Amino acid sequence: MARYELVKRSVALITLTNPPVNALSSAVRHAISKTMERALSDPKVTAVVICGENGRFCGGADIREFAGPLRGPPLVPLLDAIEAGEKPVVAAIEGVALGGGFELALVCHYRIAHYKARLGLPEVTLGILPAAGGTQRLPRLIGIPAALELITTGRHVSAQEALKLGMVDQVTEQNTCEVALEFALKAVGKPLSSRRLSMLTTPCPPGLDGIFEAATMQVQKKARGVMAPLACVQAVRAATLPYSEGIKREGELMATLFSSGQAQALQYSFFAQRTAEKWTLPSGAQWNNSKPREIQSAAVIGLGTMGRGIVVSLARVGISVIAVESEKKLLETGRQMVIGMLERDAKRRGVSASLNLLKFSLSLQDLKDVDLVIEAVFEDMALKKQIFRELSRVCRPATLLCSNTSGLDVDALADVTDRPQLVAGMHFFSPAHVMKLLEVVCGPRSSKEAIATAMSLGKRMGKVSVAVGNCPGFVGNRMLMPYLEQATFLLEEGATPQQIDKALEDFGFAMGVFRMSDLAGLDVGWRVRKESGLTGPDVDPKDPPRRRQGRKYCPIPDMVCQQGRFGQKTGRGWYMYDKPGDTNAKPDPLIQNLLETYRSRYGIQPRKITDQEIIERCLFALANEGFRILKDKIAGQPEDIDVIYLFGYGFPRHRGGPMFYASMVGLERVLERLEYYHHALPDVPHLEPSPLLKKLVARGSPPIQKWREHIKSMHSHL
């Protein structure tokens, strides 16, 4: 796990060997300890260089070991011993020096970085803090303000920025290890006291209290309710104390964080994202037995908000794109907006815009040679079928045909083509060039090659891609329905939009359900409800106003839309805004009047509703639908659902996702509360506990990592 060599006659070269990122596993720590002891005790050795195998210095702790007892030497005393050694130690940093890897570099007396290396302390993103002296040494090296920013955000920095900040001593484009070896020889005999960061006094600028107060306010605003960033501020503050006191405080804060549910949720989220990449189809096809095609050219049909974002996402990763619109004016508007988006994106990233990859057309005939087509017109099945028929006629037989539908039947689109096996859904989230999530929808006839290609393309575009089954709404939007429904029922019963939103935002959502709806546009859901026969001229005349299709229905959202209140775009929605397009939501007395009139009309006596009830009804209904989705094989594993909600719907990452949250609350508790609310509202099917939830509780409420076994067992008995 660490190779030892004597080079240049007097330099001990220690190479970490734990692929892929040379993580500091127990075996690696043990090897570092033994090789450092050997180097420091060998009179022939005058200096030490530490590097990593395969162009990577060290990616930090092996977080797979977090769940078990500590094995191998603890990191803090190991690093302290390296720093205290009497021979100069040089870190040769290539690839990454992150987390514990950067803390290892900090105890080296000198740091040489390759110009492509990236450095940082990202522990805060896992719900913890740098606990091997990182919060104590970095402020001593670069000062409190810069250290606070890096540690509380977990941001990685380039080698050039690291040099500017003082995190490294030299940046090289040459062989980093060779440069470090020469540097080490020149350092022999030089005093090391000023290079031992723990021995230095942290520079304290004027107004130190104000700096920490501002940092506290900033992390509270940006990471509402999240423990780790606040603990990082407190740990950096402890760097103003003697090292022995500061490192003790760092350890105390780490112990508190490590045992918290938030750390468990954030670490689960980290692994869930990787688990979702390992997709499996009901047919048995999966990520490791399906070869994707290489996509060099693509087409996007429709240059609305979504289509423009998809074009940008494709072009900025080097794919030639033909963008198609039905009218010249729409095409020209779309062209100008796409070019502007690409130019701004290129300027931000410091690269040239990929405008030469773009072609704009009014004719589907131009798509005859592309590798893949993504249809992104509005949600009209008849229109989409018409387009897919034409694509089937125009495109070469091997072209993949994908739809960006947010919930329509992908198999119905496959029906009208000559290649149903090459039809799949690629559900982007708006704005598509910003949002990370991509639902790849597998129809019953979608081939493993088609799904593998869509998943691979998503990854190439920087998306977090999740393979899901075909049903109305797929995973994300299907689950959203009971969540939204419960929010409107709570309005009926006495809550206000701002009360519900505040409860959800205090839970950790960036936006509550009604602010989110105003942003998305209330007319979108209204159109879907009309098409579903829930409102408008197609409603069954026998249905009472508050019942549809044999179940409870809340017409309040329809009443809001009937007044022309479509959200931010019209300056009025669930909230009022100073002008159309404004984002500053204010409570609207007209909405309160509408609610009071509605309750009076239907004889509803408003009652006091607690934040706990809001959270339970909205989130337990959300998770309950997730259990149904797992039972129906629309999602293959709970991690898929959680990743979709973390990256597509703003579920707070420190809560892990709706399924992980249910497991942390306790499945018995979730079942008991759903039964309670379903008893109170028996005509709301979404509150009836899922058979899978009941089965898991009957089997002792296993941890979420074990659900897959029980789901397979349940499927085998169906």
Swiss-Prot record:
Where substrate is bound, by residue?
G100
Q: What is its EC number?
A: 4.2.1.17, 5.3.3.8, 1.1.1.35
Instruction: Tell me one GO biological process term.
Output: fatty acid beta-oxidation
Motif annotated as Microbody targeting signal, chain positions? 716-718
Tell me where in or outside the cell this protein is found: Peroxisome
The record lists its disulfide bonds as none
Q: Is-annotated flag, keyword Isomerase?
A: yes
Kindly state which reaction or reactions the protein catalyses: a (3S)-3-hydroxyacyl-CoA = a (2E)-enoyl-CoA + H2O; a 4-saturated-(3S)-3-hydroxyacyl-CoA = a (3E)-enoyl-CoA + H2O; a (3Z)-enoyl-CoA = a 4-saturated (2E)-enoyl-CoA; a (3E)-enoyl-CoA = a 4-saturated (2E)-enoyl-CoA
Keyword tags: Fatty acid metabolism, Isomerase, Lipid metabolism, Lyase, Multifunctional enzyme, NAD, Oxidoreductase, Peroxisome, Phosphoprotein
PROSITE patterns, per database record: 3HCDH, ENOYL_COA_HYDRATASE
Leader sequence segment: none
Where is the site Important for catalytic activity? Answer: E123
Indicate whether Chaperone appears among the record's keywords.
Answer: no
- Region: Enoyl-CoA hydratase / isomerase; residue ranges are 2-280
Q: Name one GO cellular component term.
A: peroxisome
Query: Could you tell me what this protein does?
Result: Peroxisomal trifunctional enzyme possessing 2-enoyl-CoA hydratase, 3-hydroxyacyl-CoA dehydrogenase, and delta 3, delta 2-enoyl-CoA isomerase activities. Catalyzes two of the four reactions of the long straight chain fatty acids peroxisomal beta-oxidation pathway. Can also use branched-chain fatty acids such as 2-methyl-2E-butenoyl-CoA as a substrate, which is hydrated into (2S,3S)-3-hydroxy-2-methylbutanoyl-CoA. Optimal isomerase for 2,5 double bonds into 3,5 form isomerization in a range of enoyl-CoA species.
Could you tell me what this protein is called?
Peroxisomal bifunctional enzyme
**Organism, scientific name:** Danio rerio
